[in-house]
Amino acid sequence: SNILNEDSLGYNGKYGFGETDKDFPADAFILNPPYSAEGNGMVFVEKALGMMNKGYAAIIIQNSAGSGKAKSNNIEILKSNTLIASIKMPSDIFIGKAGVQTYIYVFKVGEKHENDHVVKFIDFSNDGYKRTSRKKSKNNLIDENRAKERYQEIIDLVKFGAGKLNI
């Protein structure tokens, strides 16, 4: 792996250590861009996807990233990447840190998004966890309703679709 803590807009796509003159052939990434950045953070997504030839990407992004200021970024992204799923996350997922509704966008990298491609829109606002914002609590995340199983179900939905699952 090549795990780096860098400014992703300034990242040149090279290995961060070892053979630093060679391109790192990433085939997967997870990104949580700053939502206040250009295009509601989608400028980071566009750059990261543009550095890959193939693979998959998961983006944790605010709900407004699908429209408005991000529209031109999204058009460019979909010219060479397919949106597989848009997953609505719980509104309190960043409780105590941020109060923004977030989604996870899952992309297949290197394949143009065709107009007839079916995107999976998944409402995961009830993930089974209860969150608290108590500062001194040892556990601010309580599994109240099969949370681990629910997260596995989301993975299976994205990978296989509802037709292959017993839901």
Give the predicted meaning of each segment.
Residues 11-167:
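A conserved structural/catalytic subdomain of Rossmann-like adenosyl-cofactor enzymes
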